[in-house]
Structure formats: C-alpha cells, structure tokens
A protein has these predicted regions:
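Multi-pass alpha-helical transporter architecture, strongest
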Residues: 55, 84-89, 192-204, 379, ...
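A membrane-interface helix-boundary motif in multi-pass transporters
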Residues: 160-191, 391-427
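Helix-loop boundary and gating motifs at the non-cytosolic
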Residues: 1-50, 233-269, 276-280, 350
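Cytoplasmic membrane-interface "Motif A"-like loop-to-helix N-cap segments
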Residues: 61-75, 300-312
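C-terminal transmembrane helical hairpin of 12-TM major facilitator-type secondary transporters
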Residues: 305-353
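Central cavity-lining transmembrane alpha-helices of secondary-active solute carriers
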Residues: 40-61, 279-295
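C-terminal ends and interior cores of transmembrane alpha-helices
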Residues: 75-97, 313-329
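Juxtamembrane intracellular "pre-TM" segments in multi-pass secondary transporters
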Residues: 1, 203-239, 264-266
Length: 450
C-alpha cells in the first residue's frame, strides 16, 4: 500500500474514534442519570490535555517509538471505552447506570490515553514522511483531511445505526435505539481504537533521535514557554486564547441534547433535525475542512488580527443562530448556518494563532510555545468554559421524560434560548475587548503551512 495512503488510513481511524461519541455523548448521559454532569465529561478532555500529551511526548522522544506508543495508547483507550459500553449494556436500554462513579472513572482513563494520540498521530506522520524524503508541507494536509472525513463518517454511522428486537439497521427517522442515543456509541469508539492499535504495528518504524547534551526537566515539559508572559502582547494573546477556548466545547457538549430536545415537542417530534442531530452537526466538520483552505487568502488579505476577530465574532453567530432556530422551516436554516459558520469560528483562530506564535517566538521554544497555546485554548479555556456552560444550562434546563412513539425517552428541555444568547454575549464581549486591547506588530506573512 502507498505510504501516504497508509498514513491517511491512520488519520481516518484516529478521528473516527473521537467522532463516534464526541457530539452525541450528552444524549446518552441524560438517559444514564448523568445529565447534570455533561459539562464534566467534556471538561475531563481539557483537564487531561493539560498534562498527558506532554508526558507521552517525552516517552515518544526517549523510550518508545512513536508509532508503537500510539498503538499502545489506543489499546488502553479502547479497552476503557469498551468498559463504558459494557456498563451501559449491563444496565440495560433506557436505564440509569447503577455505578456512575466507575463509569466516570473508565471514561476519564480512556480520555487520558486518547488525547495524547492526536499529537502522536502528527508526530508519526511527519517522521515517516521525512524519513522517506517526502514534503511534509505538500503531503501532510491531504493526509490530515482524511482525519476529518473519519470523524464525519462515524458521526453519520452512529446517527443512523440502530439495534432493536428486529436486528441491526439504519434509519434517518425517529428511533430511540439509534447509537447516538445509547451506549453503543462507546462500543463503536472502543472497537475502532483496538483496530488502530493493531494497525499502528504495521506502520514503518520511527527511529528515536537521541538529543545531544542534557535537557532540563523544565525544557522537557515545555515550561520555558511561560517566559512569554513577560511580554505584554504575548500575555494578552494567551489570555484571549483561553477566553476563546471557553467557547470550543460548548456546542460539542450541548448541541446534541439541544437539537434532540425538540422531540419532546409534538410539532417537531418527527422532524429531520430533531431525529438526526449528529448528522446535522456534522456540517460543522465539513465547514471546518473547507475553511482551512480559505485561511491563506484571508491572512494575506487582512492580516492576523482581523482573521482572529473573524473567528471571535463567528462564535457570536454560532451561538446566536442556535438561539434563533428551530427544526421546522425556515428555522432549521439557522441551525445549518450555525454549523456552516463553525468552520470560521474554529479554524480561523486556531491556525492564525499558531502562525502568530510561530512568528513571535524564539526558535528554541517554538514547540513549547505551540504547546502552551494549545494548553490555554483546549486545556484551560475549554475546561473552564465547558464547566461554566454546564452551570448555565443546568440553571435554565432540566432532563424530563417523554413518551415518543410508544418509547419512554429523556430530553434536556427548558429555556435554551437564554443559554445560547448568554454564550453569544460572552463571545461578543471577548471580541470587542480583543479588538480594543490586542495590537500586534504587523509582519508580512511569507509562507503559510498547516
């Protein structure tokens, strides 16, 4: 098999594992009696992202070849995720989990081993491409795009797949036993992780590179990058990175339960949007893939600050459109627009922010600085934002039982509009403050790579 195809398959599986549950997990948690803890399940991903990728990076640098470590991480992540499935299976369809603490522990351990694999996948791809004299700038983006395709593929699969007394099947209609509502989403994720574990051991070896001289623990952990906070503009940038990061996981955690809650309203119970929340939100990932291609033009035309501002104000529309829409026409158009604008909201800050860090930092600490940027957005910011969003949602909404087509189902219902407009207002305030206080030095952008 062609080397680039093999790496593309690796990326496909890597993100397929995540796509199986990331946007629909909240629906099952409500049924399992953990509806008020949805925010914690997404915050856990941010918490482990603060330290686990760094620790596994050190192991990959010194002790275990990256492709093998990637496989081992997926073995453990998959095993713990299958454990989550087993607990749901034992509890039975539509029933609360008897041991919620154990379920949370298994999920946390799965995340702890999965989150480092995102960076490890990049390391493996870059290392193998370079060792085979291939151009990473030219050859990596198409490989990475297959990751987004994998994420979308499993979103569509769990959205449509179901198992009931009649057997296994697919449907776009109303069915309470679709994987997007049940513990089966964890089974899909766990099995894919185990498949990727086996696949990793078929990949070419990545040689360990011994670094000359002694490297301090601070350097190994990337702590040198914290010196950047001494510079006002960099300190402001990282603070705003955390504030923007507070928006990142909100819709991953609550868009699914929000859209599905319309099934509790008779006029929307059989609507496409209410019954296919995971498929509908996959438009966000499609938009994300397309917007990556637009970034070079916007950066060269408008500069880094304007592109970052576009991202911040895109979050205003992302949340605002959810607050305006409903599953019927023309309201569903606002849901679609919210998903389309997600690509700008997510990509424009992440990519332009990475370029800003690359331009402003000493080459010796660029890698650590990029790690700090990711920690502030996906770690600290996402964790605080998700927990705060959870408190807001729990204040205005609650899980209630409904009978839909003869099946007892649980939906998170309440004043969703206030929740979405609160999130939109936060993004608007952050955007205005960013426009006023962040004043980066204008530098020419000669080359843009992803």
């Amino acid at each position: 098999m062609n080397l680039k195809v093999r790496l593309a398959v690796m990326n496909f599986l890597e993100f397929a594992v995540w796509g199986a549950y990331l946007t629909c997990m909240g629906n099952y948690l409500g049924i399992a009696g953990l509806g008020d803890k949805i925010s914690w399940f997404y915050a856990i991903q941010g918490i482990v992202s603060i330290f686990m990728p760094t620790l596994m990076g050190i192991v990959a640098d010194k002790y275990i070849q990256p492709q093998r470590l990637l496989g081992l991480c997926h073995l453990f992540a998959g095993a713990f995720m299958i454990g989550c499935w087993w607990m749901g299976y034992e509890a039975g369809f539509g029933n609360e989990l008897p041991n919620k603490s154990l379920f949370i522990a298994l999920y946390t351990l799965s995340c702890a081993f999965y989150m480092p694999t995102i960076a490890l996948t990049n390391t493996v791809a870059f290392t193998i491409l370079k060792e085979n004299n291939l151009d990473t700038v030219k050859d990596f983006p198409p490989i990475r795009v297959l990751g987004t395709v994998g994420f979308i593929a499993t979103m569509w699969f769990v959205n449509c797949a179901f198992i009931d007394d009649a057997g296994f099947g697919f449907t776009l209609g109303e069915n309470a036993r679709k994987f997007q509502y049940t513990y089966m989403q964890f089974f899909v994720s766990g099995i894919l992780s185990v498949v990727l574990f086996a696949y990793c051991f078929t990949l070419p070896q990545c040689k360990l590179v011994k670094k000359e001289g002694k490297v301090s623990l601070a350097e190994s952990l990337g702590l040198n990058a914290f010196k950047l906070f001494k510079r006002r503009q960099m300190a402001l940038f990282f603070i705003f990175s955390a504030l923007l990061g507070m928006c990142l996981q909100v819709t991953n955690g609550f868009a699914g339960p929000f859209l599905t809650s319309f099934k509790g309203i008779p006029e929307f119970a059989n609507s496409f949007a209410a019954n296919n929340a995971t498929l509908l939100t996959s438009i966000s990932q499609m938009s994300e893939a397309c917007c990556i291609l637009m970034i070079p033009f916007f950066l060269k035309r408008f500069g880094i600050k304007i592109v970052m501002l576009m991202s911040l104000f895109a979050w205003v529309f992302r949340f605002g459109f959810f607050g305006i829409g409903n599953p019927a026409m023309p309201g569903v158009i606002f849901f679609i627009l919210s998903c389309v604008v997600y690509g700008v909201a997510f990509d424009f800050f992440n990519v332009s922010g990475g370029i800003f860090v690359d331009q402003e930092c000493d080459p010796k600490i660029k890698a650590s600085a990029q790690g700090l940027f990711m920690m502030m957005t996906n770690g600290l910011g996402a964790t605080i934002g998700t927990l705060t969003a959870g408190e807001i949602v729990n204040k205005f909404c609650s899980w209630e039982y409904f009978i839909v087509n003869g099946e007892k189902q649980s939906f998170l219902v309440g004043d969703w509009q206030t929740c979405w407009f609160t999130f939109a207002t936060f993004a608007l305030v952050v955007g205005i403050l960013f426009a006023i206080v962040f004043k980066p030095e204008k530098k020419p952008i000669e080359k843009i790579t992803h």
